[in-house]
């Protein structure tokens, strides 16, 4: 349906309005394409069944509790009535001197989103470091809403392509679904493995990352070589 905006802002020129209307048409096309891609994602057939019920370590819900260590299974991450699990692979391996700044920036925002997301799905963050080290970092960041897991004693990261053969960590978000008492892989952000366009990185989770979406609205954009840091 043909549609034209009647909105006008103070002092805008005819050139501005013509360019903005063209951009608005492109934004509407993008909005439609985003939904079309989301529909394709929703219609994916079931992926492979979980090869094993991976065991993880986690601490108490209260990050101030530094003594409690709980051992559980991936199946335990599913709550009653919620049959989808999103599991983010946090690049913080035992050989890394510090956590990945990019992952950290993403998780800073996900921590705020988590209480809302929890109404619709199960959400957790997994890293290869020992659970005590993961929680210490989370305390320093002020994360209070993320369920943090250590995969130090299992092969989850390797099996689901969040770890290289040399032990390097990759920032993959994977989704699993529970069907009839079994757990299946549903989706992973495989765009992280695809070649990036010139002047870009893989942008595999950018749709979920407020920082980049905000910067994309600005005349300056993201910047050619700017990336989040652990501190400023």
Predicted regions and their residues:
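Thiol-based oxidoreductase modules, predominantly thioredoxin-like and allied folds used
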Residues: 114-133, 144-155
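Non-globular targeting/processing and membrane-anchoring segments
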Residues: 1-85, 90-115, 119, 137-140, ...
């Amino acid at each position: 349906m043909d549609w034209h905006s009647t909105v006008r802002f103070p002092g805008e020129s005819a050139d501005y309005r013509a360019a903005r209307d063209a951009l608005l048409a492109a934004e509407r096309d993008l909005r439609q394409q985003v939904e079309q891609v989301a529909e394709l994602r929703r219609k994916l057939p079931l992926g492979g069944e979980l090869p094993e019920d991976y065991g993880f370590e986690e601490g108490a819900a209260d990050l101030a509790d530094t003594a409690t260590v709980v051992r559980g299974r991936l199946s335990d991450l599913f709550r009653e009535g919620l049959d989808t699990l999103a599991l983010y692979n946090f690049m913080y391996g035992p050989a890394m001197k510090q956590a990945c700044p990019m992952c950290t920036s993403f998780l800073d925002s996900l921590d705020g989103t988590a209480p809302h997301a929890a109404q619709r799905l199960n959400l957790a963050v997994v890293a290869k470091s020992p659970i005590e080290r993961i929680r210490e970092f989370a305390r320093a960041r002020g994360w209070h809403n993320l369920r943090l897991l250590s995969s130090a004693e299992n092969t989850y990261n390797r099996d689901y392509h969040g770890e290289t053969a040399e032990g390097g960590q990759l920032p993959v978000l994977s989704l699993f679904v529970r069907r009839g008492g079994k757990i299946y892989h549903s989706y992973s952000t495989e765009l992280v493995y695809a070649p990036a366009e010139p002047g870009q990185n893989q942008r595999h989770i950018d749709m979920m990352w407020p920082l980049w979406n905000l910067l994309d609205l600005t005349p300056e954009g993201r910047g050619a070589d700017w990336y989040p840091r652990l501190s400023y």
